A protein has these predicted regions:
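Protein kinase-like catalytic core scaffold
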Residues: 142, 179, 206, 249, ...
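Extreme N-terminal starter segment of soluble prokaryotic enzymes
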Residues: 2-10
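Conserved N-proximal alpha/beta basic substrate-recognition cap immediately N-terminal to
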Residues: 13-125
Length: 316
């Protein structure tokens, strides 16, 4: 990559599988007359130095790395210091990724979530403050989830049944809060589970069938939405966007046997955007392409509105 020049949009990632997604964003940006630079771990040190020196500049940073890779946080800090627009800034990601916080916010907003018990971190409260009787409303088995340790079900216990299971899980990430959560059983018909993943990208909602057991996507068609009364799914994603304050995220929603839409996995702030055409468990290509198009369009709109460099810290 060139370490010199002025760019409208910088794309940063520490995950090699973001390559196809970034290629689509670059293509969409070019169609809108936006220049781009992609920053990978191998480029980070030189890029950061070039940005400090002023030999490399960008107006917007789409940062897929800083929340999980501390070495990228410095670049975001530098960008913030120069009042660049950051999509999405670290403080917004931290707020949205806290499952305990989102659970309470969702309930306050009238969204339906699984029955949940929230526990303080083991390090500060070794005694969970609950008894075996308190587990009864969760059913058996139930989930044990760290509130802030995210990505690929990291730290999640899928088949907990006892207080001993809870205590063992809490010791895995002793500085994190934990959620004990009932299993939501989705409606099933003709072998299809009514479990969905919704995507929010800069004011636009998309959704797909997503099997929580196989982790495979299937296109959700307008005919599906009409036939099964799935319109509320899209409104739920919009309401979550208003709560979490991210420009781009995904969420999981299940339609249960009682006809209720239940938000089962709150805000995925680091969406896996591998293409289905390249990976069996990837996201449908049409969704990924639309996200790329929405991102590029959002960047162009924000730059046009600001007249250049942004003084705004994050998405609203």
């Amino acid at each position: 990559m060139s370490l010199r020049g002025n760019f409208d949009l910088a794309l940063a990632s520490d995950w090699e599988y973001d390559g196809d997604f970034f290629d689509l964003i670059v293509d969409e940006a070019q169609l809108l007359g936006l220049s781009t630079v992609v920053i990978w771990p191998a480029d980070l040190a030189e890029t950061s130095q070039a940005f400090r020196d002023g030999t490399l500049n960008f107006r917007v940073l789409f940062d897929r790395a800083a929340s999980a890779a501390p070495e990228f946080a410095e670049l975001q800090s530098l960008a913030r210091g120069r009042e660049r627009l950051i999509l999405d800034p670290m403080e917004n990601l931290r707020w949205a990724s806290d499952k305990a916080t989102m659970h309470l916010e969702f309930l306050s907003a009238g969204l339906l979530a699984p029955y949940t018990v929230i526990l303080s971190p083991f390090r500060t409260s070794p005694d969970p403050g609950i008894s075996a009787d308190d587990l009864a409303p969760l059913g058996r088995p139930f989930y044990v989830k760290p509130a802030n340790t995210t990505g690929g079900s990291l730290g999640v216990v899928h088949d907990a049944e006892t207080l001993a299971d809870v205590e063992l899980a809490r010791r895995t990430y002793p500085d994190d809060k934990y959620l004990l959560q009932e299993r939501v059983v989705p409606r099933e018909r003709d072998g299809r589970r009514f479990w969905f993943r919704g995507f929010w990208s800069y004011g636009f909602v998309q959704a797909a069938w997503w099997d929580d057991r196989t982790h495979l996507y299937t296109e959700l068609t307008p005919a599906d939405v009409a036939a099964d009364g799935l319109e509320p799914l899209f409104d739920i994603v919009r309401r979550i966007a208003a709560i979490c304050r991210l420009g781009f995220f995904s969420t999981e929603v299940a339609l249960d046997g009682w006809g209720r839409f239940v938000v089962v996995d709150y805000v995925n702030e680091a969406c896996d955007m591998r293409l289905q055409s390249c990976h069996a468990d990837g996201v449908p290509d049409t969704i990924v392409r639309t996200v790329a198009r929405r991102l590029a369009g959002h960047v162009r709109e924000r730059l046009a509105r600001s007249g250049g460099f942004s003084t705004e810290g994050g998405e609203k």
